[in-house]
Amino acid sequence: IILHQKYDPDTHFADIFSFPQLQTGVQSVAEVETIGSNVSEFKPGDHIYMRMGHGSHQLMAAKDCSPIPHGMDLKQACWAGLAKTAHRAAWAGRFEPGQHILIIGAGPVGQMAIRWASHSGADTVAVVDISTTRLTLAKKGGATQVFNADIADCLDDIQSLNAGIGPSIVVDVTGNAAVFQHALAAAARFGKVILLGDT
């Protein structure tokens, strides 16, 4: 997406992701090779998660690293940052049992939000995306209902959720400013609309 500049025009990405100084990535998992004399939290061989661009080697302050539990698959651990981002929606929305939650956008952060909503005990975890592959993953992750459509084209179906009241929480994970008006229209009266990620 970034390499081929496939992001919405006139967004802050154009300023951030300019070539050739671009360093890709925002999070990494790594194995500690050496430590400084004042580091007591880690030792060589430990696996860590860090908010840092991709690279073969990094010099990091210990305070900017998080331990990965021994035995955890690093392919799973690399999702920690996205899970934390999605957790912000669960925290802000106060996800809890009995709620009716709509997630617009089933990309990586959306997939994590689906899992937070499902594990919270929500009665409905509805997901809107135009990708059948993403919606298949959404079902595996706990979505109770999926809409393979643009949000603008399925508002009537969404508003029929929760006995016609609509979703109590709408999480827009698309990063597309044009979706916001539809997210507002989809929410139940006095419902919450959460923008998660960049727009």
Outline where the language-model segments fall.
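Glycine-rich cofactor phosphate-binding loops and adjacent beta1-alpha1 units
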Residues: G93-F95, T136, G141-T199
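A structural motif shared across PLP-dependent enzymes of the aminotransferase-like
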Residues: I1, R51-A62
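Mid-domain Rossmann-like dinucleotide-binding core that forms the NAD(H)/NADP(H) cofactor-binding site
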Residues: D73-A152, D156
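Short glycine-centered segments of the SAM/dcSAM-binding site in methyltransferase folds
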Residues: H47, H100, G191-V193
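Glycine-rich beta-strand-centered segment in the early N-terminal region that forms part
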Residues: I2-M52
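Conserved acidic E/D residue at the C-terminus of a beta-strand in Rossmann-like folds
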Residues: T34, D129, G197
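Short, compositionally biased
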Residues: L59-M72
